């Protein structure tokens, strides 16, 4: 079973929804809206689940909140004889009761979240790729997983790090070029190597770690190179923070634009039951404003 919510306008959605599910004879359930993805997972209990980090972050936040507020869960998970029973119930409640393999991609995911899911017995693995190389170049998997990395290079492809730290890719999965844009193609594919624009490193075991985007690295007025990705992801580990955008080019200091997670405010600060929180952010905001009026 597989829950499909990836946009078919993207190559990864095309790869999985139009090819992989046929080859593997998967029963595919198509989500009517990305906002309902987790609800579909709870109903379908898919064996395969593919997502961006944000959905895993939401599931993680709700599970952690449930554990913190329910003493029986908090205590039960610490007792060896009961731990497996409670973990199974939590997996089922989150929509991962039958899950065999899950992929996280498109953006970095906090290692703490992956560690928590693996602790519960939910096998979520981080991978890496882009449209220009047909979605995938490296991935973690059972028996070959290093949390914090995006895995090892897949067979039949080549991967290396340039002198400036940029990740370079070579293989039959790399595109021929951009449609009717030879200039962009020449700048992106040099001597057969795809210039990804991502900065990373490969450790002694062959695992790839992405540390930032080449074009996003900026220089402060004091001359220090700043990779915003690491700081942004650290800020997003705070439950109430939804998104974070760092700026500081040619400045003495870094500033951050932060958006709050309305569902966490409703759940943790107003006391609304998770199942009663609307999926639509605008409706979440209306609930918060209505609560503020009551308090005033």
Roles of regions detected by a PLM:
Residues 1, 8-89, 98, 119:
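Conserved AMP-binding/adenylation subdomain of ANL enzymes
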Residues 199, 238-262:
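C-terminal boundary motif of the adenylate-forming
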Residues 54-57, 61, 107-108, 173, ...:
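Alpha-helix/helix-capping structural signal
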Residues 28-31, 98-104, 111-165, 173-176, ...:
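Conserved ATP-binding loop and adjacent catalytic segment of the adenylate-forming AMP-binding
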Residues 77-111, 288-296:
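Alpha-helix-centered segments that form part of catalytic cores
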Residues 153-220:
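Conserved ATP-binding/catalytic segment of the ANL
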Residues 174, 189, 207-236, 265-290:
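Adenylate-forming
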Residues 22, 201, 205, 246-248:
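Membrane-embedded alpha-helical bundles of multi-pass transporters/translocases
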């Amino acid at each position: 079973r597989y829950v499909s919510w990836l946009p078919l306008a993207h190559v990864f959605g095309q790869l999985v929804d139009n090819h992989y599910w046929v080859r593997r004879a998967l029963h595919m359930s198509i989500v009517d809206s990305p906002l309902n993805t987790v609800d579909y997972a709870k109903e379908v209990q898919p064996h395969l689940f593919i997502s961006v980090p944000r959905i895993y972050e939401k599931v993680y936040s709700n599970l952690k909140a449930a554990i913190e507020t329910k003493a029986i869960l908090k205590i039960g998970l610490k007792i060896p004889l009961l731990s497996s029973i409670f973990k199974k119930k939590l997996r089922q409640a989150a929509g991962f009761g039958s899950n065999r393999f899950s992929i996280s991609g498109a953006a970095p995911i906090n290692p703490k979240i992956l560690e928590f899911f693996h602790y519960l017995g939910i096998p979520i693995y981080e991978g890496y790729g882009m449209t220009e190389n047909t979605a995938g170049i490296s991935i973690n998997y059972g028996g070959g997983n290093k949390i914090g990395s995006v895995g090892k290079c897949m067979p039949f492809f080549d991967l290396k790090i340039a002198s400036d730290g940029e990740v370079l890719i070579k293989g039959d999965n790399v595109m021929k070029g951009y449609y009717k844009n030879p200039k962009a193609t020449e700048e992106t594919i040099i001597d057969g190597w795809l210039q990804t624009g991502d900065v990373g490193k490969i450790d002694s075991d062959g695992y790839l770690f992405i540390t930032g985007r080449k074009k996003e690295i900026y220089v402060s007025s004091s001359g220090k190179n700043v990779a915003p990705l690491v700081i942004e992801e650290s800020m997003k580990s705070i439950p109430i923070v939804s998104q974070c955008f760092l700026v500081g080019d040619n400045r003495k200091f870094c500033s951050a634009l932060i958006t709050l997670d309305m569902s966490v405010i409703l759940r943790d600060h107003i006391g609304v039951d998770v199942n009663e929180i609307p999926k639509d952010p605008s409706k979440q905001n209306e609930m918060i404003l209505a609560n503020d009026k009551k308090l005033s």
